[in-house]
Curated annotation (Swiss-Prot):
Coiled coil: none annotated. It comes from Yersinia pseudotuberculosis serotype I (strain IP32953). The active site is at D8. Keywords: Hydrolase, Magnesium, Metal-binding. This is HMP-PP phosphatase. The gene is cof. CDD domains: HAD_Pase.
Length: 273
């Protein structure tokens, strides 16, 4: 019996309308009623997630910013990592050869110097929005992560530039095909979940996790049972071939799996693609 379940949000629980489906909500409530601790592990900001969970009538532990912050169900901070100030300064002052927009995340919000209202569509449920700013107006300390947003091919080229210039001072991951994240060295959902598990007197072997993108890789590979969404990025499926693939997000594949696990955990699971 797993005692904690960790869920990615976009592409795992959140459907195309950026909401959790009713069947999935029902399954999550059943899981909590069965005594399993709910944890939501996402690249989204804490303020964004609190709005989503409040709207959905859910509560649980939060791993946000792809592992840069861990909070309990009341919002009390349990763990955090920030980017080094000198790295933040370097990223903001370097003229990168890219058309990507740059986004910086701090405890007090999401900051960018480019106004792109289309990015707000994914945050309509919570009302979370970016704050337009001049980069030199922000402190260099207290920054969780950067996101670069543009087409995937441009991001692949940008990632090569960043890795060459930063020489192991940060970690990089694709949270979506069009979103490249720069994170503190050694920071990911897997490390954050390990910290949370220790806080709860659990081990990662006591946990199951669900995800669809490369920012889920460490979490999925380290838990007792990692489940890969049918709609997951091909690279994730290729790098974690040992893990079971379940249904797609739009089919509420997490709910289908949880209903099976809660009712017949001893039987082999067969997804409906």
């Amino acid at each position: 019996m797993y005692r904690l379940a960790a869920f990615d949000m976009d592409g795992t629980l959140l459907m195309r309308d950026h909401k959790i489906g009713s069947i999935t909500l029902n399954a999550l409530h059943q899981l909590a009623d069965a005594g399993v601790t709910l944890t939501f592990a996402t690249g989204r900001h804490y303020l964004d997630m609190k709005g989503i969970l409040s709207h959905s009538g859910l509560n649980g532990y939060l791993i946000t910013g792809n592992g840069t912050r861990v909070c309990d169900a009341e919002g009390n901070p349990l763990y955090g990592m920030d980017l080094p100030a000198e790295l933040v300064e370097f990223v903001l002052r370097t003229p990168w050869q890219t058309n990507a927009s740059i986004h910086l995340f701090r405890d007090d919000g999401w900051f960018t110097d480019r106004n792109d209202p289309d990015l707000l569509i994914a945050h309509t449920t919570s009302g979370f929005h970016f704050q337009l700013t001049e980069w030199d107006e922000l402190p260099l300390t207290g920054n969780h992560k950067f996101c670069f947003i543009v087409s995937h091919q441009e991001l692949v080229e940008l990632k090569a530039q960043l890795e060459q210039q930063m020489s192991g001072e940060a970690d990089f991951c694709f949270s979506a095909t069009d979103c490249l994240e720069v994170l503190p060295r050694g920071c990911n959902k897997g490390v954050a979940l390990e910290k949370l598990s220790h806080h709860l007197d659990l081990t990662l072997a006591d946990c199951m996790a669900f995800g669809d993108a490369m920012n889920d890789k460490e979490m999925l590979s380290r838990v007792g049972r990692g489940l890969v969404m049918g709609n997951a990025l091909p690279q994730l499926k290729q790098e974690l071939p040992q893990l079971q693939i379940i249904g797609r997000c739009e089919q509420q594949g997490v709910a289908h799996y949880l209903h099976h696990w809660l009712s017949s955990p001893h039987l082999t699971y067969s997804p409906e693609f």
